From Swiss-Prot:
Pathway(s) it belongs to: Amino-acid degradation; L-phenylalanine degradation; acetoacetate and fumarate from L-phenylalanine: step 1/6
Gene transcribed to yield this protein: phhA
Native source species: Mesorhizobium japonicum (strain LMG 29417 / CECT 9101 / MAFF 303099) (Mesorhizobium loti (strain MAFF 303099))
Top-rank taxon, per record: Bacteria
Swiss-Prot/TrEMBL keywords: Iron, Metal-binding, Monooxygenase, Oxidoreductase, Phenylalanine catabolism
Disulfide bonds: none
Catalytic activity: (6R)-L-erythro-5,6,7,8-tetrahydrobiopterin + L-phenylalanine + O2 = (4aS,6R)-4a-hydroxy-L-erythro-5,6,7,8-tetrahydrobiopterin + L-tyrosine
Cofactor(s) listed: Fe(2+)
Cofactor, how bound (note): Binds 1 Fe(2+) ion.
Name this protein carries in UniProt: Phenylalanine-4-hydroxylase
Entries under Pfam families matching the protein: Biopterin_H (PF00351)
Amino acid sequence: MSVAEYARDCAAQGLRGDYSVCRADFTVAQDYDYSDEEQAVWRTLCDRQTKLTRKLAHHSYLDGVEKLGLLDRIPDFEDVSTKLRKLTGWEIIAVPGLIPAAPFFDHLANRRFPVTNWLRTRQELDYIVEPDMFHDFFGHVPVLSQPVFADFMQMYGKKAGDIIALGGDEMITRLYWYTAEYGLVQEAGQPLKAFGAGLMSSFTELQFAVEGKDAHHVPFDLETVMRTGYEIDKFQRAYFVLPSFDALRDAFQTADFEAIVARRKDQKALDPATV
């Protein structure tokens, strides 16, 4: 799909982002010219969320925040990329908003993480329909400083297109959703912690997912994850719990995706409440 075609589709859906300045790979310049109000919104979001992440986030996420410096002001993507390259070889690229699957996977395969270059308004502190800079940056980027998870994300980008070609587009999306977006981890002898970006950037769901008495925690199994439906605009009805990032990487490396997709692609998605 061309940039122009995708821009028309996004406009028809009421999505934000200036796609008129996109390059062929859907990247744009960050154009660091944010208003005082945008900087204030960023600080408000970070101040509020870090009160929770300090208690509920996995240590690799917290280490990433400290090493990359994301809290005091809207980050300069190139400055953070310089730090991130030294840690795991990843870099940050600016995009106008959501981008098509193919270029997204290509960026991941080359250790480039797309980050939206605009920020939600003060009226959207609690909920925003589409991913913005706070979700992409505060949510996703810190854990990319963790070498094993960073490796998984690159492997995902390299393999996703092949899995889609097999007919597993919904299945590979579910895997991303339940790991990169809503993943939990509980290492041996340690309390349950969160790392997924959808949780890191949500004040209410982060608390529910980790501490809620009604949160449904399920041991991670790659094939089960790929079969389980998910929620878009409400709290998840299941959260998959990794024993470690190594377990995620190893499961992905050793999975026979051709066999999994052939076996499961025509089956109805599992109800997350009953997995």
